[in-house]
């Protein structure tokens, strides 16, 4: 049976992008997830080719962007993270919950809840997974490529986060 992301979580929209520069191909998968607890490792196990046994994500933090996880699997290097509706990007459910507890107690969220349109906490996320093959580059160079692409991607989508 498929792994649940959280009790009420659902992937509303999923998109796949591929970018080519010289001999390097960058693949990006983005899913708009509702009702999530923000556990990226759990989402990776439940929704991607990493179902088999993804191992542990190595966590990293970029100032002004937030957290992301890096994982090498077979001949690819992956970067995965959740763009939050407010607050920096997160990888673990603890980071996601911290953002919700510190960012969502606002008048507009309270009004949203009082009108019966949802929870005070905004449990949505733009779950992004990027990857590059390791045949054309080494893991250190691949990590730099992924992190540079991630910063641009994050800045673009953070400002365009969908309305609830």
What are the language-model segments listed below?
Residues 124-164:
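Surface-exposed amphipathic alpha-helical segments
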Residues 1-116:
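Short, solvent-exposed recognition patches
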Residues 119-122:
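Accessory, solvent-exposed terminal regions and/or long lumenal/extracellular loops of proteins
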């Amino acid at each position: 049976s498929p792994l649940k992301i959280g009790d009420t979580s659902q992937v509303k929209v999923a998109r796949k992008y591929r970018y080519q520069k010289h001999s390097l191909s960058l693949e990006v998968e983005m899913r708009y997830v509702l009702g999530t607890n923000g556990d990226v490792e759990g989402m990776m196990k439940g929704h991607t080719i990493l179902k088999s046994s993804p191992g542990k994500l190595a966590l990293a933090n970029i100032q002004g962007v937030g957290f992301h996880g890096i994982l090498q699997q077979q001949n690819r290097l992956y970067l995965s993270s959740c763009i939050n509706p407010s607050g920096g990007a997160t990888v673990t459910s603890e980071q996601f919950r911290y953002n919700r507890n510190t960012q969502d107690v606002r008048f507009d969220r309270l009004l949203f809840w009082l009108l019966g349109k949802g929870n005070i906490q905004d449990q949505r996320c733009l779950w992004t997974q990027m990857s590059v093959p390791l045949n054309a580059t080494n893991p250190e160079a691949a990590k730099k490529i992924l992190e540079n692409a991630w910063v641009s991607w994050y800045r673009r989508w953070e400002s365009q986060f969908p309305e609830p």
